[in-house]
């Protein structure tokens, strides 16, 4: 059986942090108060010296750990391929950045690092020896619109299995299992003048797997009346897409679970009954619980809808614990 621990990615509290309502210590303290057993830190957002970690920052993190009882369990790195004005980073440059991130993760005491899939499968293969040397398990984030069964992710599976390395794998984001439209996007469209009838028509086109270009043509007259509808329809085919069922995707998750180092418990809106309205946690958590997974599910509140970040994070942690019978 699994040994699931619950944590929080500090990204969940990014809005109060960026607005100055909480400093970094306040964010860590709040995560502890909400029941996190550990936290993921988004390096670009909260480490002043990123991509490096200073001795002073390590000292600060260790003092917070002594005070609040939780420390960083995952170093969330970014692969900013487009950071230069005139060209994309080469693969060699991206590999070098990933190695720097591995070293920083190790210095901070993290044994897991989230990497983005802008790093190619070959790049992941190349960093495996460094991950092992620094005892940092590097997981490619499986983020919507990818899923455990899409060709791009299967290319990583092939490399992981070919190398046999225990230090390269995945960090699945539960948003890739969505089966209903995203509530924040839906509500914004309503506020911009779209009707429920128009939005339901858009959703049905997505459920029916009508290609985006064709769907745009079908909805052209409605989009002309309400331009915001175009962005909402486009989002249904992008990073917040959904499908009728996630059964196949969950079967794919079962296959890659031995390669998973952490899981992102994505949430956009958790209601007062502890139900995420678009992501079927009631189907996802039993799959993880029945496995041999030994790691964290970290709450990741996306904060697209302007809801209270602390309330949403609190609800999500409670929902996961309830489904895990913890």
Go through each PLM region and give its residues.
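Active-site beta-loop-alpha junctions enriched in small/polar residues
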Residues: 9-15, 42-44, 77-80, 118, ...
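Hydrophobic faces of well-ordered beta-strands that scaffold small-molecule active sites
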Residues: 4-11, 39-41, 72-77, 113-115, ...
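Active-site mouth loops of central-metabolism enzymes
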Residues: 9-23, 81-95, 116, 241-244, ...
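Charged helix-capping and loop-helix junction motifs
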Residues: 21-25, 53-59, 91-99, 121-125, ...
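Active-site acidic/histidine proton-transfer and metal-coordination neighborhood
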Residues: 29, 63-71, 81-172, 176-222
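Glycine-rich, proline-tolerant flexible connector loops at the mouths of alpha/beta enzymes
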Residues: 38-64, 304
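Gly/Pro-rich active-site loop or hairpin
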Residues: 15-22, 149-153, 180-294, 307-311
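C-terminal helical cap(s) of enzyme catalytic domains, especially alpha/beta-barrels
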Residues: 309-326
């Amino acid at each position: 059986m699994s040994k699931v621990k619950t944590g929080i990615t500090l990204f969940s509290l990014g809005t109060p942090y960026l607005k100055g309502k909480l400093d970094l210590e306040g964010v860590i303290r709040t995560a502890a108060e909400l029941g996190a057993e550990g936290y993921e830190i988004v390096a670009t957002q909260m480490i002043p010296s990123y991509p490096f970690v200073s001795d002073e920052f390590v000292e600060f993190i260790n003092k917070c750990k002594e005070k609040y009882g939780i420390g960083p369990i995952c170093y969330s790195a970014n692969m900013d391929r487009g950071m230069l004005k005139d060209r994309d980073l080469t693969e060699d440059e991206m590999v070098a950045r990933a190695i720097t991130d591995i070293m920083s993760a190790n210095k901070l005491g993290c044994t897991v690092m989230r990497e983005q899939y802008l790093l190619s499968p070959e790049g992941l293969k190349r960093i495996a020896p460094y991950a092992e040397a620094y005892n940092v398990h590097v997981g490619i984030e499986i983020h919507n619109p990818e899923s455990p069964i899409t060709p791009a992710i299967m290319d990583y599976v092939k490399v992981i299995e070919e190398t046999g390395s225990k230090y390269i794998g995945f960090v699945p984001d539960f948003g890739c299992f969505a089966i209903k439209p995203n509530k924040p996007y839906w509500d914004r469209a309503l506020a911009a003048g779209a009707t429920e009838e128009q939005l339901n028509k858009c959703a049905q086109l997505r459920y029916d797997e009508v290609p985006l270009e064709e769907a745009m043509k079908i909805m052209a007259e409605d989009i002309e009346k309400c331009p915001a509808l175009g962005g909402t329809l486009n989002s249904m085919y992008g990073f917040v897409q959904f499908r009728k069922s996630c059964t196949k995707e969950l079967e794919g998750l079962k296959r890659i679970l031995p390669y998973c180092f952490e899981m992102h418990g994505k949430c956009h809106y958790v209601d007062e009954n502890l139900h995420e309205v678009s992501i079927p946690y009631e189907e996802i958590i039993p799959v993880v619980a029945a496995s041999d997974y030994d790691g964290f599910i970290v709450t990741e509140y996306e904060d697209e809808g302007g809801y209270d970040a602390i309330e949403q994070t609190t609800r999500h942690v409670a929902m996961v614990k309830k489904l895990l019978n913890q």
